[in-house]
Regions:
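Acidic, glycine-rich loop-and-strand cores that form catalytic or ligand-binding grooves
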Residues: 145-170
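Short, flexible/disordered intra-domain loops and linkers
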Residues: 136-147
Length: 187
């Protein structure tokens, strides 16, 4: 059975941007790629042009995918960039479908608290110090108040009862922080 990867475009973007980036993986059968298009080319995080219920939209796609017996509904993942990254965070908070999410170049926002009933999910949060669009140290952009990227990772970790003293690795100027639950490994 094939794992499923949702790939969400950024604000103003198109779902086709992910097709070519992930084509070699989907063509080789590593997973089935799902590339939804946000209404008005954005995902509704509160201040965007779209006021669509994007959580319901993604849930409806997942419900439809349940009709295919060659898909592994226990291995659903989501990756998104920028506005799509914010939507990936929202899906991680408001749904229980995802085994892991990868928000790229965004972090949690003050308006997006992790809920008590949020199902633990693996998070691969990517931020960059040279990204001047989304403030890595927190602050306002695009009508949102972003948390500091590291604080965002800590908030996920603390809500999912992970070790708050992360494993830190630095390779060629890139630093990774890994927060594990007691029974997890990085393998």
């Amino acid at each position: 059975d094939y794992p499923i990867v949702f790939a969400l475009h950024g604000k103003g973007g198109k779902n086709t941007s992910w097709v070519n980036q992930l084509k070699s993986f989907t063509d080789s059968g590593e997973f089935v790629g799902i590339y939804p298009q946000g209404h008005l080319d954005s995902w509704n995080l509160g201040t965007e042009p779209s006021k669509a219920d994007d959580v319901a939209f993604i849930n409806s796609i997942i419900k439809e995918l349940e009709n295919y017996n060659n898909l592994n509904m226990n291995k659903i993942y989501a990756i998104g960039t920028s506005n799509g990254s914010g939507m990936v965070n929202k899906l991680g908070i408001h749904t229980s479908h995802f085994k892991a999410i990868a928000p790229v170049v965004s972090q949690l926002m003050e308006s997006m608290p992790i809920l008590d009933n949020t199902k633990p999910v693996s998070i691969f949060q990517i931020n960059g110090a040279k990204d001047f669009t989304i403030p890595i140290n927190g602050g306002s952009a695009f009508g949102h108040n972003f948390l500091d990227a590291y604080k965002s990772a800590e908030l996920w970790a603390s809500n999912f009862e992970c070790n708050l003293s992360p494993e830190v690795k630095s390779i060629n100027g890139t630093v990774s922080y890994t927060h594990l639950r007691a029974h997890e490994t990085t393998d």
